[in-house]
């Protein structure tokens, strides 16, 4: 195979508009987002390559929520203005090393400056794959990430509850979530009727939140509290997948998932 270097530029524009009415709850949301990505891919050898790039994102949100619950005694009519504009620029690098179909490792890092939060973020990530045998594959990955939440659209179902929606500290509300995800999977291919016609895989991932946005529906019977928390919070996810193709054009799938969360 020929080793080549590539230079690419990608621009993407997204427009989203939503008007939702749940009884006396009126939500209006509008988003315009522009993303530009300049990427250079260089092959050192057939086994190793490096991707470097720069990225810029412009996001304009126009959001509002009128929360009226006159049937709840002493409840206030609330109006929330979530308008904001986010500008973010950053750079990234990703190194890949592979030994044919036997082993591969990917290590990446990126740094981004977000003008809305006036913060610089560093987010490392890594992925490893090892084909232990032709029919057994082990994968592992880890990565740190940040996410600017849209608290109403992320929890749109709360508008249908008829309850008062309260953000206790609206001016100090931190919508930026930070989390670390670590996990892996083990996949085994085997034969039941014919060779390699079945696959069994086991996945485990843990997400540790360092700041999370919570829609608390348990604190009060007539209110939903929206707030951010930097307390211990995590999610453990276990999943088993089974697939089998006993005959051509017939596929059988079965999945079991167990999730354990603490907030």
Annotate each PLM feature.
Residues 98-101, 200-208, 228-263:
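Gram-negative outer-membrane beta-barrel transporters
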Residues 1-118, 192, 196-204, 253:
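Face-selective signature of the C-terminal outer-membrane beta-barrel domain
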Residues 2-20, 131, 139, 173-228, ...:
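Membrane-embedded beta-barrel scaffold of Gram-negative outer-membrane proteins
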Residues 47-49, 82-207, 260:
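Structural signature of Gram-negative outer-membrane beta-barrels, strongest in the C-terminal barrel
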Residues 29, 84, 175, 231-232:
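Aromatic-acidic/polar surface patches that form glycan- and anion
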Residues 10-12, 19-26, 63-71, 117-124, ...:
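Outer-membrane beta-barrel translocator domains and adjoining extracellular loop/strand segments
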């Amino acid at each position: 195979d020929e080793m080549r270097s590539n230079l690419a530029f990608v621009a993407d524009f997204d427009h989203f508009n939503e008007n939702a009415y749940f009884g006396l709850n009126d939500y209006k949301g509008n988003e315009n987002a522009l993303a530009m990505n300049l990427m250079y891919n260089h092959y050192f050898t057939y086994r190793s390559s490096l991707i470097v790039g720069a990225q810029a994102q412009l996001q304009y949100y126009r959001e509002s929520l009128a929360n009226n619950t006159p049937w709840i005694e002493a409840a206030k009519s609330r109006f929330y203005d979530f308008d904001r504009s986010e500008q973010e620029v950053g750079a990234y690098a990703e190194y890949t090393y592979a030994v044919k179909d036997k082993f591969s490792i990917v290590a990446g890092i990126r740094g981004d400056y977000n003008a809305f939060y006036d913060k610089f973020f560093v987010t490392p990530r890594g992925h490893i794959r090892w084909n232990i045998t032709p029919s057994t594959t082990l994968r592992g990955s880890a990565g740190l990430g940040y996410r600017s939440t849209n608290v109403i659209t992320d929890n749109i179902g709360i508008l249908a509850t008829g309850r008062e929606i309260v953000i206790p500290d609206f001016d100090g509300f931190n919508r930026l979530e930070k989390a670390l995800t670590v996990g892996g999977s083990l996949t085994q291919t085997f034969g039941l009727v014919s060779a390699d016609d079945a696959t069994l895989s086991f996945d485990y991932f843990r997400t540790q939140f360092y700041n999370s946005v919570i829609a608390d529906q348990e604190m009060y019977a007539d209110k939903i509290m929206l707030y951010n928390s930097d307390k211990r919070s995590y999610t453990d996810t276990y999943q088993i997948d089974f697939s089998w193709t006993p005959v051509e054009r017939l596929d059988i799938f079965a999945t079991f998932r167990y999730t354990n969360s603490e907030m």
